[in-house]
Design a protein with these regions (language model features):
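Conserved donor-binding/catalytic core segment of Leloir-type glycosyltransferases
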Residues: 5, 199-223, 229-236, 242
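A short, active-site helix/loop in glycosyltransferases that binds the activated sugar's phosphate group
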Residues: 152-189, 376
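N-terminal strand-loop element at the rim of the active site
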Residues: 7-15, 29-68, 163-171, 248-252
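Membrane-proximal helix-turn-helix segments that form the acceptor-binding/catalytic region
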Residues: 139-157
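Conserved acidic donor-binding segment of nucleotide-sugar-dependent glycosyltransferases
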Residues: 329-337, 344-350
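Acidic donor-binding loop of glycosyltransferase active sites
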Residues: 282-298, 311-312
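An aromatic- and histidine-rich active-site surface loop
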Residues: 72-84, 93-126, 298
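Glycosyltransferase donor-sugar binding loop
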Residues: 45, 184-185, 216, 239-255, ...
Length: 384
């Protein structure tokens, strides 16, 4: 039996972002009976208690509330508890898979302990976290140093994007790397235009099928909301811009409003978050075009979902995005007027089925969870 300890996500069941969804899908689509997953779960109330989720052994870690440093303490406590389990249960050849770079600067001592019990350390750097503008300069410097420490000391660095793997290879030549993509759900929405749920939602926001452009994603500056909204407002389209994000109570919302005055354009509609997956898929499938502005990171889950559900995708042209969407999308830059011109061009057209078919073919070939989980299981069972 190969035991894999997964550390660095908030845990299961998945309720948050990319890492949590990845872990959920990894255990949900488990194919081999020779694998046993142990998943750290951040808790505010319980410590070192166990529960089972989709066959995985989940354990809670009650990390002290230290502000941004809490995640570092969480990872440290989780690793120590996993080491304790390995010793008590006499587990041989365990794999410790750490997601993210937060603990990186302190990884050296843990590498020795992991190797001392016959274990291997695999890490996933989570894109270029240190480049995110939400971090202060000191935090960015720490994250860059943490990335360096983990890349140079891990037994294997797993990247979910070819661009990230290339960056790791170029930046840290001694690092051993492996590319395994992120996955996505390809299931089409079961809802139809006649369903009451759809009509209620569309009437609430005064929307019509194919009558809107769409943005979905974390509400942070590096996702280029300012450029996308400013350029949309410059365009001549009569369609709306629907923005699905966590803007409520976010200071960036007021900053963005002051910079762009989007509240003066009735086409721009911030509609909050949508947690109903079936509804979100319908909204994606019936948008005229999806605008993807993510600039930092690896394979973005939102881009994969767009390629799987939307025919026309207008994507910010960085290497990370191009390596995924390839020729199935149109690309834009931050140059003034570039995206507005692209919107004006596509707005006059109507048939983008060929692009959509190409995008879905890319997803089916390279990004289904079944394929991704199969690659991870092959790695876990044979790499060490």
């Amino acid at each position: 039996m190969q035991h894999v300890f997964i550390i660095g996500s908030r845990g299961l069941p998945a309720q948050y972002g990319g890492f949590e969804t990845f872990v959920e899908e990894l255990v949900k689509h488990q194919q081999s009976s020779n694998l046993k997953y142990h998943v750290a779960c951040l808790s505010n109330t319980e410590h070192e208690t166990h529960f089972e989720h989709l066959g995985a052994d989940c354990f809670t870690i009650k990390a002290p509330k230290l502000g941004p440093a809490r995640v570092i303490a969480y990872d440290m406590m989780a690793i120590n508890y996993c080491l304790k389990m390995v010793k008590e249960q006499r587990i041989s050849n365990p794999i410790f898979y750490i997601l993210g770079n937060t603990i990186g600067a302190f990884i050296g001592g843990f590498v020795k302990k992991i190797h001392a019990v016959g274990g291997h350390l695999f890490v996933n750097p989570d894109g270029l976290e240190w480049k995110r503008s939400k971090w202060s300069k000191p935090v960015q410097a720490y994250l860059k140093y943490a990335e360096k420490c983990k890349a140079n000391q891990a037994d294997l660095v797993i990247s979910d994007n070819i661009g990230i793997e290339t960056y790791i290879k170029n930046s840290y030549p001694t690092a051993k790397t492996r590319f395994i993509a992120y996955g996505t759900d390809t299931q089409v929405s079961s809802l139809t235009a006649k369903d009451q749920k759809i009509r209620t939602y569309f009437e609430k926001w005064d929307l019509t099928e194919k009558g809107y452009y769409l943005i979905v994603g974390r509400f942070v500056p590096e996702n280029n909301y300012e450029t996308a909204i400013r350029e949309f407002m410059l365009s001549e389209t009569k369609r709306d811009l629907v923005v699905i994000c966590n803007h409520e109570g976010n200071a960036y919302f007021d900053t963005l409003r002051a910079k762009t005055q989007f509240d003066m354009d009735e086409r721009v509609k911030f509609v909050g978050t949508v947690y109903d997956r079936d509804l979100l898929n319908y909204v994606r499938e019936n948008t005229f075009a999806y605008i993807h502005g993510h600039e930092v990171g690896g394979t973005n889950p939102g881009l994969l979902e767009a390629l799987g559900h939307t025919d026309l995708n207008l994507v910010f042209g960085v290497d990370f995005n191009k390596s995924v969407a390839q020729s199935s999308a149109y690309y834009w830059t931050k140059e003034a007027g570039n995206l507005a011109s692209l919107i004006n061009d596509v707005d006059k057209q109507s048939d983008f089925k060929a692009l959509g078919e190409q995008a879905r073919a890319i997803i089916k070939e390279s990004y289904t969870w079944e394929k991704i989980v199969g690659e991870y299981e092959e790695l876990f069972l044979h790499e060490n």
